[in-house]
Amino acid sequence: MSSLRTADDTWDIATSVGSTAVMVAASRAAETERDEALIRDPYARLLVTGAGTGIWESVLDAKFVETVAAADAEAAAIFEHMNSYQAVRTHFFDAFFTAAAEAGIRQIVILASGLDSRAYRLDWPSGTTVYEIDQPKVLEYKSATLAEHGVEPVATRREVGIDLRHDWPAALRGAGFDPSRPTAWLAEGLLMYLPADAQDRLFEQITELSAPGSRVAAETAGVQAEDRRQQMRERFERIAEKFDMTASLDIQQLIYEDPDRADVADWLDAHGWTATAVSSQQEMRRLDRWALPADLTDDDAFSNFVTAEKLS
């Protein structure tokens, strides 16, 4: 269970779950500036620097990164791994959307979109509409920040400012969503912030709204044994204290580690979808981005990247 979450908690871009979107955008910005980047997000740095979260802006400072590397090799490896994980994850789901567009899907829904910039940076075909669902303040920050810099979306972009714990299907329809048309759905960086029963309900709602030919992609929530979870928590607490990042790295307090959480691929297969799961470890190694210490094994809790298609 999460110790900082309540049934009706809300947030903006600088607090609670909202601030994790800044962390992810910081990783995309760092990746974009690599010589051989897996993804290019020219807007990530803009979104990070205006968020007011402090530490994630610092992570984009080359001198800070050099200081961490010089002071603590383990911390440097973990930060590198975190950035690489986000890059690999983004790369995987970018490819999912590219394939969906090539298959003729023109209706996109990004759940808990945060600072996702795909509506602005992917090469969407004409006639594509991207619906972004998230807390109103998060969506307002993103659209206002990019508009201030003259950035316009490539696709038609429609904001659906609502908590996913409320009646988001009705709000989505109200924004123009057509459930009779095939849709490509994405739940990236979301499921770990939902209790197990809420995850099931989310996929039930997606299924109800999906016409044949629809596709869905999701990053699963990893579940660890308690002793391993405590070991990882202590490792991150030590790093956070050493580099004055305590408030920013307390992500474990925001997520739900329900042991009875359904396997996403199995759930989809049982509810009218044909699903495939790729382990994040496998994908990171395939792209030569594995950087964690050797004491972490495949038995540790890493997410899977799941894609599925609804055939009927």
From Swiss-Prot:
GO terms for molecular function: methyltransferase activity. S-adenosyl-L-methionine binds at residues 134, 163-164. Its EC number is 2.1.1.-. GO terms for biological process: methylation. Gene3D superfamilies: Vaccinia Virus protein VP39. It holds the Pfam family LCM. The keyword Glycoprotein does not apply. Keywords: Methyltransferase, S-adenosyl-L-methionine, Transferase. Exhibits S-adenosyl-L-methionine-dependent methyltransferase activity. Belongs to the UPF0677 family. This is Putative S-adenosyl-L-methionine-dependent methyltransferase Mjls_0078. It comes from Mycobacterium sp. (strain JLS).
